[in-house]
């Protein structure tokens, strides 16, 4: 079972382009009290919503591995989603094909690799 699943993270934060270019991820984590998913993912987690975060925030509905049975359960009822990959071995197109999902809708799936080298999908909705 993933450490990510058990650390009570309910919100995912994606920094905006200026933060990504500046690369000040440690400062961002300290200033907003968020934790990085891993060193190279540039996605951050928190247990509570973060006001004023410079980027987009999402509420995490489910976290799943690429295990077929787990995926089938996690994606039940989802026909389309916005997919982003960060530090992940598959491209968005490859992942979309594998998940058999159309583009769009209000579901956001972030595919990433944790610090423990575990490949995870974070299934979420935009927060506010």
Positions of predicted regions on the chain:
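SAM-dependent transferase fold signal centered on methyltransferase-like domains
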Residues: 1-128
């Amino acid at each position: 079972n993933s450490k990510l699943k058990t650390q009570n993270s309910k919100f995912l934060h994606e920094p905006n382009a200026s933060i990504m270019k500046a690369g000040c991820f440690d400062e961002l984590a300290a200033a907003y009290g968020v934790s990085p998913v891993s060193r190279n993912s540039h996605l951050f987690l928190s247990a509570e919503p973060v006001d004023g975060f410079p980027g987009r925030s999402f509420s995490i509905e489910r976290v799943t591995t690429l295990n077929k049975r787990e995926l089938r359960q996690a994606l039940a009822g989802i026909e389309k989603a916005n997919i982003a990959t960060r530090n992940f071995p598959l491209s968005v197109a490859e992942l979309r094909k594998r998940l058999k999902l159309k583009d769009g809708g209000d579901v956001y799936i972030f595919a990433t690799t944790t610090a423990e080298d575990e490949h995870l999908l974070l299934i979420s909705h935009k927060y506010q």
